[in-house]
């Protein structure tokens, strides 16, 4: 599975041993350098029926894990994308062919895209340093994003502040930007990006969005009305440990970095660790699974920090969790096929939002409830938000539909952010105009 080089060390029971393991893991990562994916391919499989979907699902249970689902088996109408290590390609292709599963090669060599990505980042970093600037059209490390946050807050202190809502498993600060024009107990909107660490386009979109808010306040009537009446909170790096690991070691890491005594594999899927429907369909009890839900609801500090903050605030009216990829806008439920009580309103709002998004660059999104549009998923952010009384709960899946997957070129950051902004603006305006 992803992260195998870091997954074979068993932590001891004491805090001292845990610190020792973390130090050892850091040293090991530094010594080994970034994982190499030369020859790894992303295959796209189109299942004809539920039986073929089940055959694809069986691949996740193989030990050791032989595939990494980028888009898992959901329904026959949706493609399944999976990364296959070079060493497993022959066997996996033979498995697909023997069961009559048609496939195509979406990405011929993942390492080629990774090399291009690193070269683009290095070039951008040199330019930023020489001009003492920050590029919104480039990807950045955790350290660079946190440095930008400090500068951003200092430059726009009249409207933006920084709040630390907790610490990650590896003791990174969990930071939230608060956009506010003052006043007490304003109703609020929550936006988070990067809960799955390899989805870099989401962090970049969040950063651009933050800058858009301060740039357009006072100029864009809709945004100005929103911010005069409501506060906006943006968590740019929801999974800081995992995100740092995607830069230092494994670009394709999804989960957080929590470790537990006696468990060989590292990390929990933070979007399966919420209380609503915890442990149900669409999550996994196997710690080595990419959708491992963790030992208990909100066991992960990254999730608990959000729950505690939103609950203590008590006046959030919308929550928007931004993921990639697939070009979708969805609302609850994920764990149930039954519609929520205000399903018609959410459907109409999602329709308006994707229409606004489409007008920017002509990118098409599909929309609907999570369980009927994508797949059944339990213990997810938006289900928890909705069950906690946040009426307008949405989840984005940003660009693209599989040509690059999680390795979306930096040249697409700005257009992705621009179109996403129009959808966000639509949702926020509706929230403003429909108080509850």
Curated annotation (Swiss-Prot):
It is found in: Secreted. Its cofactor is Zn(2+). Substrate binds at residues 196-199, 254, 271-272, 324-325, 375. This is Carboxypeptidase A5. Disulfide bonds join 265-288. GO terms for molecular function: metallocarboxypeptidase activity; zinc ion binding. Zn(2+) binds at residues 196, 199, 323. One of its GO terms (cellular component) is extracellular space. PANTHER family: CARBOXYPEPTIDASE A5 (PTHR11705:SF16), PROTEASE FAMILY M14 CARBOXYPEPTIDASE A,B (PTHR11705). Its main location: secreted. PROSITE patterns: CARBOXYPEPT_ZN_1, CARBOXYPEPT_ZN_2, PEPTIDASE_M14. Keywords: Carboxypeptidase, Cleavage on pair of basic residues, Disulfide bond, Hydrolase, Metal-binding, Metalloprotease, Protease, Secreted, Signal, Zinc, Zymogen. Gene3D superfamilies: Metallocarboxypeptidase-like (3.30.70.340), Zn peptidases (3.40.630.10). Residues 34-126 form a propeptide. Binds 1 zinc ion per subunit. The active site is at residue 397. It is an enzyme of class 3 (hydrolase). Expression is very low or not detectable. The lineage of its organism: Eukaryota, Metazoa, Chordata, Craniata, Vertebrata. Residues 138-431 form the Peptidase M14 domain. Pfam families: Peptidase_M14, Propep_M14. GO terms for biological process: proteolysis. The gene is CPA5.
């Amino acid at each position: 599975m992803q992260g195998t080089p870091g997954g074979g060390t068993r932590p001891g029971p004491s805090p001292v041993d845990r610190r020792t393991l973390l130090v050892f893991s850091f040293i090991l990562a530094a010594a080994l350098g970034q994982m190499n994916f030369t020859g790894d391919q992303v295959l796209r499989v189109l299942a004809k029926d539920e039986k073929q979907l089940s055959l694809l699902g069986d691949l996740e249970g193989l030990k050791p894990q032989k595939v990494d689902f980028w888009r898992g088996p959901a329904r026959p109408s949706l493609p399944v994308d999976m990364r296959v290590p070079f060493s497993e390609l022959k066997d996996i292709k033979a498995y697909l062919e023997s069961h009559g599963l048609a496939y195509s090669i979406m990405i011929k060599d993942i390492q080629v895209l990774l090399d291009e990505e690193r070269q683009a980042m290095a070039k951008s970093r040199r330019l930023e340093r020489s001009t003492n600037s920050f590029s919104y059209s480039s990807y950045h490390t955790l350290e660079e994003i946190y440095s930008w946050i400090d500068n951003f807050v200092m430059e726009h202190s009249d409207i933006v502040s920084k709040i630390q809502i907790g610490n990650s498993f590896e003791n990174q600060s969990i930071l939230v930007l608060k956009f506010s024009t003052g006043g007490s107990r304003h109703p609020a909107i929550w936006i988070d990006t990067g809960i799955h660490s390899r989805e870099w386009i989401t962090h970049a979109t969040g950063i651009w969005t933050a800058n858009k808010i301060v740039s357009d306040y006072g100029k864009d009537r809709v945004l100005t009305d929103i911010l005069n009446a409501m506060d906006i909170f943006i968590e740019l790096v929801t999974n800081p440990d995992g995100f740092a690991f995607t830069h230092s070691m494994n670009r394709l890491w999804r989960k957080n970095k929590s470790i537990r005594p006696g468990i060989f594999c590292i990390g929990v899927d933070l979007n399966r660790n919420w209380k609503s429907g915890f442990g149900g369909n669409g999550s996994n009890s196997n710690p080595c699974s990419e959708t491992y839900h963790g030992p208990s609801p909100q066991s992960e500090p990254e999730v608990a920090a959000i729950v505690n903050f939103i609950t203590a605030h008590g006046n959030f009216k919308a929550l928007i969790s931004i993921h990639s990829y697939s070009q979708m806008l969805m609302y609850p439920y994920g764990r149930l096929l039954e519609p929520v009580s205000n399903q018609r309103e959410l459907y109409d709002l999602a329709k308006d939002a994707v229409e606004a998004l489409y007008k920017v660059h002509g990118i098409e999104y599909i929309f609907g409830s999570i369980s009927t549009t994508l797949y059944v998923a339990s213990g997810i952010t938006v289900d928890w938000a909705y069950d906690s009384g946040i009426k307008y709960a949405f989840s984005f899946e940003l660009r693209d539909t599989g040509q690059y997957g999680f390795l979306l070129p930096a040249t697409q950051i700005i257009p992705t952010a621009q179109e996403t902004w129009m959808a966000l603006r639509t949702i926020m305006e509706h929230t403003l105009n429909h108080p509850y």
